[in-house]
């Protein structure tokens, strides 16, 4: 999988942008629970009062607190506040206070405020305890208190600040500040509303920021993944185009199609998720753990239980689903293979009435794929409800454990809510990672299959220092002691093949089925490389020149005509894109294709369906021959290309071909002797060996194998005339 990232080397800018946006999104997500906690703790419970450092105090309160503090703490408080005289109070926002002077807080740093909050909270608690004693000493005032107020005052009187939890001290201090604000005449409800509105606005701003970051990451991830899939398809296509028959034999056509479409699609989907989650999930997990530790470290055991439960579920899914993902890809290959075979051989299936058998084959492949898909989908379906059960169970466990802390005054309700949200973020981080982990096996299998193509060592390569063809030997083909053995085969199919095909002459190859004719001819365009010996074109070993330069010299017509979707003109121009319409028409005339082309309504602009399925076999073959002629090459290779033509068309075509292309070298593989009667040189093959070489007349007298072929195809009169011509010569 990591090998595929090398194709994104130039895309580092969007990758960096994705990472930065994910960091921003994670930071905002981790901040939201803090605001939720503040709304509950500060906005609702504390009436919008954030800490025990009041904005303003009465002079008597200030002096009372100062007397209860250590000298250093008292000095710090003195520095933090400024005394307002009565006249200054009248001109300030505290003008409603008429009873004396006020101490107003100056601007202080966050660090100094936190330190002052601790010292002032304790002083306020002590001052509250003194006030309790005064109330209890006043029997009339004490009698007016409710039972709950009396109980609270008794607790405050007897409790030492050293034994009290920080939350109790903080809440008592906040109550003191609230009473102080009321005494000054401040509107507590307005303060609370203002705090809630400001905090809510901040949360909305964060939510929009999260949304913008998430949308941007999604767009960038989708573009990067799409770019990677495009590059992979290009690389796979380029690699497959460089394959020889040897490499093609290692992959079925259906498998190559699946790898270049479905497998790359799997990689694209995984990459889209990977870019979004691979950075985000760890940030959320680590950040959530840090936040939990700062909120209440004693309750982290609840999260540990949830994480362990999730890891167990993921482990089980991995053990169960991983092998099935590998099987799934092979079954897709199998289904594609069966489908392709059925569609390709539909006419044969109907002719032999084997529709039922093919239906059973297809049903088996289809059912195997369906069963495996159902198994995988059931496993994936099991994951989400299990995860939700774990998350909901964890929430209940946290509430149960947090309730006792709240009851003991060790935790506030808002902190519990924040703890639950952080716990869910940690669990979601592991859930995201598990989703990536679950998709990874299938993507990993797909990546391995794509890499099998990309890493395939091509046997036929261009030389590092290519040579040029010799111009004085234009079109000459020479075989020197050539042996050839198919890859992984034990025996050679060609043995010590040596001959020269002179430039501008016709050399034909004939022999029984399996004698090696097509194999020999396919060595010239380097569909395979010789095992021993050498093949020279224009006096240069074909392994020493570029494959492109070699193929530029060759006009190749395969046994089975192959056409591409487009038009007749685009197919005939396939080997020479800049061919003029006159050159195209000339090629069609030589190939005896003009008549059926002119009969069509759109003539040369007539559409050709995929694989040439809308033309007959003979028409397809003539268009394939015309395509090679339009290229006007130095060397023509006809690999049994005339067998699909009727005898009359065959004769006309070869006659025109001989007249119009007499300057080119022509190599013909034939089954019919009538096709090669007038060849300048006929080479007879038998079991991979040359057993005869000469003209038709010469071989009738000297080659037994050729004689057998001739007797099976020609009449006695034809044979007699040939012998008479030979004797006369």
List where the protein language model places each region.
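An intracellular "coupling" helix at the cytosolic face of ABC transporter transmembrane type-1 domains
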Residues: 12, 245-246, 262-271, 275, ...
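Conserved catalytic Walker-motif region of ABC-type ATPase nucleotide-binding domains
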Residues: 240, 362, 450, 479-481, ...
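Membrane-embedded alpha-helical segments of multi-pass transporters/permeases
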Residues: 30, 34, 215, 219, ...
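Short intracellular "coupling" helices and adjacent cytoplasmic loop segments at the cytosolic face
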Residues: 44-51, 58-62, 70, 142, ...
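Hydrophobic alpha-helical transmembrane bundles that constitute the permease/transmembrane domains
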Residues: 11, 23-31, 204-215, 267-270, ...
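Membrane-integrated ABC transporters
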Residues: 1-32, 36-204, 209, 213, ...
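ABC-type nucleotide-binding domain
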Residues: 15-16, 51, 66-71, 84-97, ...
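Helix-loop-helix
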Residues: 291-308, 314, 375-448, 453-454
